[in-house]
Curated annotation (Swiss-Prot):
Pfam families: HAND, Helicase_C, SLIDE, SNF2-rel_dom. GO terms for biological process: positive regulation of transcription by RNA polymerase II. Residues 183-193 have a biased composition (Basic residues). Residues 8-25, 33-43, 53-65, 89-114, 197-211 have a biased composition (Acidic residues). Residues 121-147, 1029-1067 form a coiled coil. Its EC number is 3.6.4.-. It comes from Oryza sativa subsp. japonica. This is Probable chromatin-remodeling complex ATPase chain. GO terms for cellular component: chromatin; nucleus.
């Protein structure tokens, strides 16, 4: 089998060790994992040829790589290029050979053009044939692979039903129902049901063989050797369970609790199939987009022998993966997202998959969803569902999962519902027991408390805090706004909206538009003081920092994460952040930065829904739930980001709660729902209620209203954080005791009373509360409505516009502070001081008496004339006309041309004169450190200037080399050393250097076009088919050779000049003594050395004159 060919442009020699590694890889293509030098180029067609199993000659494989890379898409371009090259050949050739004695006649030109066209057509035909053969080989591999998968699929179904019947007799009902629909084979009259003796003996023998095979199923005592690291005992047991399912042809659900290593168990199953069964795939993993990076890393970490491909990206990236990586024989595992599984189903349907693995499988519990329908159309041997969320005992959801796992048995939802139909309340426990019997062969679920004894415990504490004055003001206004709905009980949708607004107020009042003071919007203590939870967080974080803890902060609201981000920057804490808008690469980079050893990141901000899935953040030991989710499982998933395998410390969970508000009821309901879910599974009751009803919402909204209206002052205390935590532990203990009593009481209730289980308080004070009276007592009287007597529009406008009407005195308008950006380089500090002074004075002058208290305030002074003049001067000093777009254009121009090339930068700027740009550049140079991200900006500019400097060095080096020749296009020589290129000849390298000197370094598209249009390379398909990236790499190799040659040449010239000066100043006596010391005893040697020295001097002087 031919080895993959590697082109080496600098060394031009393949080491023997590299060849051995390539032999071991056996043409695995992209999955080999071998590292290559920067100058090495691998021929993908050669690797594809090996994967196809063809044993063609090495030259043919190289030609496939050299010719087919761009010819398929650019065939018309090739034809037009070839047609254009032929007529223009005579002109260019005559110009380049003006001094030659031989002149080609017209007849010879015509013959040559005709011969070139024939050769070109022949080459194109051969190219098409080679492309056709390549596609045929790939299709043959795909057909062979799919046929093997289909054969296994037919074999695996034979013993499946028998295995299921051994587990429970329930499957006999569904099997009979299915078999009854099938057509019975025609028999032999009344003897049709009887078997012959030979058939009976054959069946008995087969049953005995199956029994022996079943009794001797595979059970691993140690993990497969291809799995790196050490698997725990329960993980090995999970692998054996998955192997048993595989051997019996059964699909399954791996439902271990979050953090127990479901990903590792799944990867170990694929490793087992690879090592022991010789099954390399293809397998497909479908997971949430946010977890794809983690899947790839885990596969590379635990089972590097598997070749994994991440199928994700924009259309161009997906097209590259589809054509180069997602090919038969080039990958083992395809990892993709739910969205890609739907969007790219045409591509993925080509394959027959060995395993389809669905992570976070609760997404397919609705059989009518697009994802569920799409996953059912893929052809696969096995399906494995992974979920950390416990399954609810809902009949239809369970049928949907069973239908996905075993569609040929659980084909009808009606039959399933009829079989499990409940005739009375006493039968419910029996029905659920039967359901669990059905699920038992497919489902494996284990809890941390049962299997992971070495995992440190998790302790949850509810920290209650009061509200600030601003929070109370907004909370009270929200209740007054929807008085009718809250008092009488309106629609559930309106109540949900009120509940959401109240929860926003509990989190931070700045979530409401206009609540934050500004503009200008500044980060200061007001960010902390105006929200009770922020005061609590500000006390908690320093304590956690002192004891070297690391913190995860979860919130449901992305805008709240913005506020927390401002706070962390204000306090100087280093942090990472992930929410629903974070891209995949940024997400992986943030997780890696937080988890790396010695990381200085103290806080990780995450949204509960986007950041609570598939992330391992076990390096943190504190979880702060800034707000609680309606679904308690979401909060549990968030906690398990830290409380999982690899955690070495006790995990502390702090759940923030605003006292006497809706949040207390939300948390209480979450605790009740967790207890009730456990009770449902224990008692065998069918879970029906999933959403909060209208009555529950009404009670939550009304809760704490009396406390809010009774006082307008802040209820935030100055207690020490240790005291707050101690009180929180007491509160949590009380709530746990209440939940225990709730569970005991709930056991006595019937299923009809399930809705009332959430309301177990004997004294429902919020129902007894006269909410309307409470609000009316604290009502702020709105202004009186004024009834207009005149209803005529014309008369109204006449009166309104009458000249003699007395005009009301208008109150002076409070000036608005302009939004000042950091790139405009204003003196923000001084301007803010002047504006605040002016605004305070005007507000005091126009403010009416408030009813809260009538204390006399100190009289404020307006701006003096000097201060007013100073303010106007400061506004003129900045660059108010420069927008963010202008600033970004200026930065890009600095990166492109350098900071000193003002003329080129000004040419890039639209609407700015050169003088304006020069003034801005001067200020930017002096005050760039005032920018918020100046480090990144300066690094980018310096990187661009370094590229410019390097480009100038390269052009000087090439110019210096070319200046040593009269006609470098014909005479240029390159000192390759020992390793000369095998595929790029000297003529090609000479043309490349001359064209780069003419076109400029970096213009690779123009260089590629020059190669294609040049008659010198009309039939050199290797050169004409090179991409711009390959030409750039070759050019870089030649530049390094030229720079090395220039350095040696400069050294020789310096040595020649030094020897010449020494010879000029040396006397005859010294010369003879030097000759004796150097061993020049014979006159002939002395004569030869002098002659060589003179020749070197002559050549050096001639070169300098030409230079």
């Amino acid at each position: 089998m031919a080895k993959p060919v590697k082109y080496d442009e600098e060394e031009e020699e393949v080491s023997s060790s590299g060849e051995e590694e390539e032999e071991q890889s056996d043409g695995a293509g992209s999955g080999s994992g071998e590292e290559e030098d920067e100058e090495e180029e691998e021929a993908p067609a050669a690797a594809a040829g090996e994967a196809a199993g063809g044993e063609e000659e090495e030259v043919d494989e190289e030609e496939i790589e050299a010719v087919t890379t761009g010819a398929g898409a650019d065939e018309e371009e090739e034809e037009s290029g070839a047609a254009a090259a032929a007529p223009g050949e005579g002109d260019e050739e005559s110009q380049s050979t003006e001094d030659d004695e031989a002149v080609v006649g017209e007849d010879d030109d015509a013959d040559e053009a005709e011969g070139g066209a024939v050769v070109g057509k022949r080459e194109k035909a051969r190219l098409k044939e080679m492309q056709k053969l390549k596609k045929q080989k790939i299709q043959e591999i795909l057909d062979t692979q799919n046929a093997a998968v289909d054969a296994d699929m037919n074999n695996k179904g034979k013993g499946r039903l028998k295995y299921l019947l051994q587990q429970t007799e329930i499957f006999a009902h569904f099997a009979k129902g299915n078999q009854s629909k099938e057509k019975k084979p025609r028999g032999r009259g009344r003897h049709a049901s009887k078997m012959t003796e030979e058939e009976e003996d054959e069946e008995y023998l087969k049953e005995e063989e199956d029994a022996l095979a079943g009794s001797g199923g595979t059970r691993l005592l140690s993990q497969p050797s291809c799995i790196k690291g050490k698997m725990r005992d329960y993980q090995l047991a999970g692998l054996n369970w998955l192997i048993r399912l595989y051997e019996n042809g059964i699909n399954g659900i791996l439902a271990d609790e979050m953090g127990l290593g479901k990903t590792l168990q799944t990867i170990s199953l694929l490793g087992y199939l690879h090592e022991f069964r010789g099954i390399t795939g293809p397998h497909m993993v479908v997971a949430p987009k946010s977890t794809l990076g983690n899947w790839i890393k885990e596969i590379q970490r635990f089972c590097p022998i598997l070749r994994a491909v991440k199928f994700l990206g924009n259309p161009e990236e997906r097209n590259h993966i589809r054509e180069n990586l997602l090919q038969p024989g080039k990958f083992d595992v395809c990892v993709t997202s739910f969205e890609m599984a739907i969007k790219e189903k045409t591509t993925l349907k080509r394959f027959s998959w060995r395993y389809i693995i669905i992570d976070e499988a609760h997404r397919i519990k609705n059989e009518n969803s697009l994802l569920s329908k799409t996953m059912r159309i893929y052809n696969t041997n096995y399906r494995l569902l992974i979920t950390g969320t416990p399954l609810q005992n809902n009949l239809h959801e369970l049928w949907s999962l069973l239908n996905f796992l075993l569609p040929e048995i659980f084909s009808s939802a009606e039959t399933f519902d009829e079989w499990f139909q409940i005739s009375g309340e006493n039968d419910q426990q029996e029905v659920v027991q039967q359901l669990h019997k059905v699920l038992r062969p497919f489902l494996l679920r284990r809890l941390k408390s049962d299997v992971e004894k070495g995992l440190p415990p998790k302790k949850e504490t509810i920290l209650k805090v009061g509200m600030s004055q601003m929070q109370k003001q907004y909370y009270r206004a929200l209740l007054q706004k929807d008085l009718e709905v809250i008092n009488a009980g309106g629609e559930r949708k309106r109540l949900l909206n009120i509940a959401m607004q109240l929860r926003k107020c509990c989190n931070h009042p700045y979530l409401f538009q206009g609540a934050e003071p500004g503009p200008p919007y500044t980060t200061g203590e007001h960010l902390v003081e105006n929200a009770g939870k922020m005061v609590l967080l500000d006390k908690l974080l320093p304590k956690l920092k002192d004891r070297d803890s690391r913190v995860l902060i979860f919130s449901q609201m992305t805008r709240l994460l913005d506020i927390l981000e401002d706070y962390l920057m204000y306090r100087g804490y280093q942090y990472c952040r992930i929410d629903g808008n974070t891209g995949g690469e940024d997400r992986d980079a943030s997780i890696e930065a937080f988890n790396k050893p010695g990381s200085e990141k103290f806080v990780f901000l995450l949204s509960t829904r986007a950041g609570g899935l598939g992330i391992n953040l076990a390096t943190a030991d504190v979880v702060v739930l800034y707000d609680s989710d309606w679904n308690p499982q979401a909060d549990l998933q968030a906690q398990d980001r830290a409380h999982r395998i690899g955690q070495k410390k006790e995990v502390q969970v702090f759940r923030f709660c605003t006292e006497y508000t809706i949040e207390e009821k939300v948390i209480e309901r979450a605790y009740k729902k967790l207890a009730l879910d456990a009770l449902v599974i224990q008692q065998g009751r069918l879970a029906e209620q999933k959403t909060v009803n209208k009555d529950d919402l009404l009670q939550m909204v009304r809760f704490g209203a009396e406390m809010v209206f009774s006082s307008k002052d802040s209820t935030i205390t100055d207690e020490d954080i240790d005291r707050i935590i101690a009180k929180g532990e007491e509160t949590t203990a009380e709530l746990d005791a209440k939940m225990k009593k709730f569970t005991e009481d709930a056991i006595k209730f019937k299923m009809d009373d399930t809705a009332e289980l959430y309301d177990f308080d004997d004294d429902k004070e919020e129902n007894k509360l006269d909410f309307k009276k409470l609000v009316s007592d604290n009502w702020i009287e709105p202004p009186r409505r004024e009834r207009k007597r005149n209803y005529s529009e014309s008369e109204y406008f006449k009166q309104a516009l009458r000249q003699g009407a007395p005009a009301k005195p208008r109150e002076p308008r409070i000036p608005r502070m302009p939004h000042l950006h950091d790139f405009q380089f204003f003196n923000n500090q001084r301007l803010n001081e002047l504006y605040e002074k002016e605004v305070r004075y005007l507000m005091q002058a126009n403010q009416k008496k408030d009813t809260i208290d009538g204390e006399d305030e100190d009289q404020l002074e307006p701006l003096t004339a000097e201060e007013q003049e100073e303010k106007e001067q400061l506004l003129e000093e900045g660059f108010a006309t420069w927008t963010r777009r202008d600033f970004n254009t200026f930065i890009r121009a600095c990166e492109k041309y350098g900071r000193n090339d003002i003329r080129s930068i000004a040419a890039e700027m639209e609407g700015k004169t050169e003088e304006e740009v020069q003034r801005y550049a001067k200020v930017f140079k002096e005050r760039y450190k005032e920018l918020s991200d100046y480090d990144r900006i300066i690094k980018n500019i310096e990187r661009g200037e370094a590229r410019i400097s390097r480009k100038d060095e390269i052009m000087r080096a090439i110019g210096k080399k070319l200046d040593r020749y009269k006609n470098p296009w014909l005479e240029l020589k390159i000192q390759y050393g020992q390793n000369k290129g095998k595929f790029y000849n000297e003529e090609c390298d000479r043309f490349m250097l001359c064209m780069v000197h003419k076109l400029g370094y970096g213009n690779w598209d123009e260089l590629k076009a020059a190669f294609r249009m040049s008659p010198l390379f009309r039939f050199d398909w290797f050169v004409k088919s090179r991409t711009t990236q390959e030409l750039a790499r070759r050019c870089d190799t030649l530049i390094r050779l030229v720079e090395k040659e220039n350095q040696e040449y400069d050294e020789q010239e310096r040595q020649a000049r030094k020897d010449k000066r020494m010879a000029k100043n040396m006397t005859p006596t010294k010369r003879s003594a030097l000759r004796v010391s150097e061993g020049e005893t014979t006159p002939s040697n002395s004569f030869k050395r002098r002659r060589q020295s003179l020749m070197d001097d002559y050549v050096g002087s001639g070169r300098r004159k030409r230079g």
